[in-house]
Amino acid sequence: MEIKEISVPQQGVVADYMNGKKEIQSCFDYMLTEDAFKQRLHDLREREFFRQDLVAHLLEYNTKLQAGESTLQNVKALGDENTYVVIAGQQAGLLTGPLYTIHKVISILQLAKEKEESLGVKVVPVFWIAGEDHDMDEINHTFVAKNKKMKKTIFYDRNPKKASASESELSVEDCRNWIEEIFKTYPETNFTKDVLKFVDDALKKSNTYVDFFAHLITKIFANSGLILVDSHHPELRKLEIPFFKRIISKYKEVQEGLRNQQEVIKELGYKPIIETKSHAVHIFMEIDDERVLLEDQQGKFVGKDGAHSFSYEELIEEMERNPARFSNNVVTRPLMQEYVFPTLAFIGGPGELAYWSELQQVFHTVGFQMPPVVPRLTITYVERDIATDLFDLQLRESDPFLNDVDKLRENWLSNQIEEPIDDHFEKAKKEIADIHTSLQQFVKKIEPGLGAFAGKNELKINEQIELLERMLKRNVEKKYEVQLNKFRRIQFALRPLGAPQERVWNVCYYLNQFGLDFVDRVMENPFSWDGKHHVIKL
């Protein structure tokens, strides 16, 4: 493997944050400097965490996942007052979801290792599985290549309901059939059987979406020391109830903090991305087997548009009696992470970084500082045949990331032709239109009744001109078919559906192509945190 860095233009909050724009950086409590991380350590030492209870739960959970010894040692280390975490999270996508989930894990492993060395304290990597999430459309699919197109392949649940991913049962047999269909779209390699068995071993141990995700991530990162936590685990929820009570007691301040911070974001010229109901208390409650967002209504906490109503006292009582019924939303999830873990740094993608900029005052209302927010590593893999295509077309490795591939293709094609086709035909159409306008005026003057026919005559001439143009372009494309197919392959591999590779392709494709140690070999590369995009030639 060979790694290169390229500067890819970013937009909005992420671009300004990485470029050191003070206005947006003021929406975060720590900069990304070594002094800021030292200050964060100092601030965390002023707080108390329920470390021993957390260690007991994480040991049990990660042991059930058959995590490696390095993971269990890291969990035990969390019991020490001088151990901290680097954390990131994601929904429990089938087959781990898009590549960026894998890249988030690589990011926390990398940063935890670096900060442990530079700060001289124990730093462990934690991945927070958003098990409470009930949006199955976000996690029930992957993309595959079919008939020279990227196709979204959905796993259809036989019994869909608005339950969390931790509680949504997974039909092992149906999922196995779905996975086999996906692997049929991959080339048969020396690794295919091993990878299928690897995935199936994880599936056989799983009852839910979160189970499958957690077993697969544990196996992929078996020797890394990665700690997994299911945010909707009932045992974890018991530990979180004191903070749920705090959120409920301060829900008005949380609402106001969000509104005020979003106003700050608007004044800085950005568009807020968190959209919630104005009366939301930012906590979900399980009602009739569904996650229901609680809202404030005349001093009561209601769900399902008032169909269910609770007083403050009733809600607190229910939290103590049935903790597992409650879960966080997009606003309170970061707060709960901060409550549970001594977080040295949070790692997020571009969207997460933008929405965290809207939470600063929310953190402050519950007495927390927002942890340092570090943009995750972004990575694209370039296979050997794609590198050859780039070379053959005399394209730089950075070109597909800095330009639209369709535009690159059009520019290349126009350079192969001495005179631009579009310009010639546009000129011809204009000249014909001018001549025909004069001709129509003459016809109407001699015989007004033929005016409509003359207009149709012009349309037919234009249709023939356009047909000629299409046929010429088709013949030119056929002449350069080999080269144009190279552009299609480049787009398919590096910018599928016009999006970054890591937002579409799944890690199983690369495990199938390069073996089960693919991710381990990726992690051997040197990565930097300067905001540049990492291109890895395979």
Swiss-Prot record:
Gene, per the UniProt record: bshC
Any one GO MF annotation of this record: ligase activity
Protein name: Putative cysteine ligase BshC
EC class of the enzyme, as a word: ligase
Species this protein is from: Bacillus cereus (strain ATCC 14579 / DSM 31 / CCUG 7414 / JCM 2152 / NBRC 15305 / NCIMB 9373 / NCTC 2599 / NRRL B-3711)
Coiled-coil segments on the chain, per record: 248-268
HAMAP family (alphabetical): BshC
E.C. code: 6.-.-.-
Key words, A-Z: Coiled coil, Ligase
InterPro entries: Bacillithiol_biosynth_BshC, CC_BshC, Rossmann-like_BshC
Signal peptide region: none
Function per UniProt: Involved in bacillithiol (BSH) biosynthesis. May catalyze the last step of the pathway, the addition of cysteine to glucosamine malate (GlcN-Mal) to generate BSH.
Family assignment from sequence similarity: Belongs to the BshC family.
NCBIfam families to which the protein is assigned, alphabetical: thiol_BshC
One Pfam match: CC_BshC
